[in-house]
């Protein structure tokens, strides 16, 4: 019911509210905007969703699966017809099942996302070997039978990523992704003054199933630090190493600010 118009990589409410250059970045989700281009764009995208999920080779010999979304489709071309059913909990996990009913489809090409380092593929219950093509697809020859079922399990683990060196704002910082999802750190989980946090980029990452705003998600736990900066009225002082090890909690970015106003960061310094 509420959403963001802009999608900042960090939110420190006191900065946005008091800074004219940042006050367009809201610290709470909004119900409506004066310039509301998003709702019609969402409607347009959903109306054409089928063409984003599936595609056909020009000679119609190969069915392409581009997006992993629960769906059913009937393909009809030049007198040929078959049905496709895709079942998945993606992006909660990398398990996908595709059923093709009809003998008029001989091959299927399934997108192999760049974030996945490997995949297990089964055709009609038998594990088969498939390589990722240069174009990023897994090509499977279907058996000559009425119903074919392809089961895939893409490897999906949390990964620490870095930005290109030309993005100076993210220098010596890191972020966490899991599958296609970008993660963030919120103060409700990690405490206030979130700018004091650091991440052990080589540390072990743990995942645990959780729920936020009615959405089942994977929460990621990481090893990190909290630096204690100068307090009180002193503006400057002699530098002292004041930090402690802490356990960091990260949630999917698209769910931030569903538990009240607070601080948020995607990119945090590395230790």
Regions found by a protein language model. Give the residues of each.
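Hydrophobic, well-ordered secondary-structure elements that form the walls
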Residues: 110, 150-152
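C-terminal beta-rich recognition modules with glycine/proline-rich loops and embedded aromatic residues
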Residues: 1-99, 133, 153-271
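Proline-anchored loop/turn motifs at beta-strand termini and strand-loop-strand connectors
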Residues: 113-116, 155
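Short strand-edge motifs at loop-to-beta-strand transitions and within beta-strands
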Residues: 96, 136-140, 148
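Solvent-exposed beta-strand/loop surfaces of large extracellular or lumenal domains
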Residues: 116-141, 160-166
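Surface-exposed beta-strand/loop patches in extracellular or lumenal glycoproteins
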Residues: 99-113
């Amino acid at each position: 019911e509420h959403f963001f118009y802009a999608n900042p990589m960090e939110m420190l409410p006191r900065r946005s509210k008091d800074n004219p250059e940042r006050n367009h970045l809201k610290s709470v989700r909004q119900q409506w905007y004066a310039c509301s281009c998003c709702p019609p764009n969402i409607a347009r995208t959903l109306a054409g969703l089928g063409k984003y999920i599936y595609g056909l080779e020009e000679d119609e010999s190969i069915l392409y699966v581009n997006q992993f979304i629960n769906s059913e489709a009937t393909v009809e071309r030049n007198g040929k017809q078959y049905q496709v059913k895709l079942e998945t909990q993606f992006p909660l996990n990398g398990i996908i099942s595709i059923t093709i009913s009809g003998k008029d489809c001989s091959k299927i090409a399934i997108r192999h996302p760049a974030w996945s380092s490997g995949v297990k593929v089964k055709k009609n219950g038998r594990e088969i070997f498939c390589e990722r093509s240069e174009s990023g697809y897994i090509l499977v020859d279907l058996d000559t039978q009425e119903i074919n079922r392809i089961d895939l399990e893409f490897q999906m683990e949390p990964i620490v990523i870095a930005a290109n060196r030309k993005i100076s704002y993210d220098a010596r910082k890191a972020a966490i992704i899991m599958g296609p999802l970008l993660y963030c750190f919120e103060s409700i989980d990690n405490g206030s003054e979130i700018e004091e946090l650091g991440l052990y980029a080589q540390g072990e990452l743990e995942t645990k199933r959780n729920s936020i705003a009615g959405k089942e998600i994977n929460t990621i736990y990481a090893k990190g630090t909290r630096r204690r900066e100068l307090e009180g009225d002193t503006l400057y002082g002699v530098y002292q190493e004041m930090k402690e090890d802490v356990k960091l909690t990260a949630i999917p970015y698209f769910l931030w600010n569903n538990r009240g106003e607070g601080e948020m960061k995607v990119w945090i310094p590395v230790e």
